[in-house]
Amino acid sequence: MSFRRVAGLVFLAACASGPQTVRNDGSLTGAATPQLAVDMFLKAVNEKDIQAMGTVFGTKDGPARQTVDRTELEKRLIILACYFNHDSARTLGEDRGTQDHREVRVELKKGNLSRQTTFYTIQGPARRWYVDNMDIAAVRDFCGNPGTGRSGR
């Protein structure tokens, strides 16, 4: 076999095994890792996407949308969206927590404010991770505070 043919086969094999995008039609909930659950939650917060927030907000039993009244869950998520809306986020670390939790520490910035907070994640069904609690006190001044340096937005 010629070098050209081998090189062509290697190229085709590399293309075929490249990164693949997994599309979520809404039936897949949780995330593959604790950090990804937090990242997905924060992305949904900034997009004001309550449905997306609900896919990674849950407990060891799965997404909260399966166990909490829809109206009640939406109220909770809207409140969380106010507190956790941010301009930038940076993961600081991840540690083992108590009662099978993983704690993901994140630095959030909003306007001229910078706060460190902790998200508590837990593994649910199908080995998927869910954000089930967070340190809201650390970002209490993010919600409704005109002093965050964000004007006209």
Model-derived features with residue positions:
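Alpha-helical interaction segments
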Residues: 5, 30-32, 43, 73, ...
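C-terminal motif of bacterial Sec signal peptides marking the signal peptidase cleavage site
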Residues: 13-14
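Bacterial N-terminal signal peptides that target proteins for export
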Residues: 1-7
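Short, charge-rich, low-complexity alpha-helical interaction segments
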Residues: 17-21
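Exposed beta-sheet edge and beta->alpha loop/turn motif
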Residues: 81-83, 89-153
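Short solvent-exposed beta->alpha transition segments
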Residues: 27-29, 35-40, 47-101, 109-112
